[in-house]
């Protein structure tokens, strides 16, 4: 199989000490039915065997980068964005799984509905429980009603709209995805959500579950358009 030098989709994945889950996460991407993509992976200073696991993959679409120190998700995603070449940006978390037709469905949905952004529904890989959320595009008044109506790992958008807002706001170590949604809404970008499960989430080890207080604080800062205080 030969691939274009300029892929249609750039997939951004940052990992820190995900040795037990990174293999399945990557496999779920390289086995997508839509094959014209690049998978950009940032090893964010892992001190377990994550890097070793990454090097086991022999796929020309995979590009591995390394941070010398742990920069966190927000800065790592911006670094990957700067190295991306696709028309579209897709997200993937290191401990989650994308279903086989995810990219095919999301790309078709965006083009059919003349959109620039969409997310998808997800299910917990541990309990078969659907992750709650809402459907179709989400106006500001609804966005602020929910804690976070879009699942970060399911994002699929035109690269140019992410660049237009300056990428992820690096003032937000947590809730960087919600801050992004706020920034996009200010640019009058419709935030659509496909009412279909395309993603499996690791709800046991999810960072949002481990850092609930920090997530809530940064969420409120984004919601109220104020900068978070950093200790």
Description of each model-found segment:
Residues 89:
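Short aromatic/hydrophobic "clamp" motif used to bind/position activated sugar donors
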Residues 49-50, 77, 98-103, 128-129, ...:
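Acidic donor-diphosphate engagement hotspot in glycosyltransferases and nucleotidyltransferases
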Residues 82, 139-222:
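Conserved nucleotide-sugar donor-binding catalytic segment
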Residues 101-132:
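Conserved donor NDP-sugar-binding/catalytic core segment of glycosyltransferases
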Residues 20-23, 48-56, 97, 101:
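Acidic helix N-cap motif at the loop->helix transition within catalytic regions
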Residues 67-84, 105:
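Glycine-rich, basic loop-to-helix element that forms the pyrophosphate-binding segment
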Residues 43-52, 69, 93:
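A conserved acidic beta->alpha catalytic loop
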Residues 27-36:
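Short, acidic, metal-binding catalytic loop of nucleotide-sugar glycosyltransferases
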């Amino acid at each position: 199989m030969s691939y274009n030098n300029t892929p249609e989709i750039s997939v951004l994945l940052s990992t820190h000490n995900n040795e037990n889950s990174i293999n399945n996460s990557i496999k779920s991407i390289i086995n997508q039915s839509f094959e014209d993509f690049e998978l950009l992976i940032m090893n964010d200073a892992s001190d377990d065997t994550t890097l070793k696991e990454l090097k086991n993959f022999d796929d020309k679409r995979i590009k591995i980068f390394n941070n010398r120190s742990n920069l966190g998700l927000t800065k790592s995603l911006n670094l990957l964005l700067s190295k991306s070449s696709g028309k579209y940006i897709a997200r993937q978390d290191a401990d989650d799984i994308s279903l086989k037709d995810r990219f095919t469905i999301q790309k078709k949905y965006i083009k059919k509905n003349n959109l620039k952004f969409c997310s998808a529904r997800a299910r917990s890989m541990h309990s078969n429980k659907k992750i709650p959320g809402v459907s179709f595009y989400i106006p500001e008044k609804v966005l602020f009603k929910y804690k976070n109506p879009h699942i970060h790992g399911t994002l699929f958008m035109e690269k140019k709209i992410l660049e237009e807002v300056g990428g992820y706001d690096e003032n937000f170590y947590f809730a960087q995805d919600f801050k992004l949604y706020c920034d996009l809404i200010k640019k009058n970008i419709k935030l659509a959500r496909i009412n279909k499960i395309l993603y499996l989430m690791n709800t046991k080890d999810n960072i949002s579950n481990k850092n609930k207080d920090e997530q809530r604080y940064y969420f409120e800062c984004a919601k109220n358009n104020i900068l978070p205080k950093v200790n």
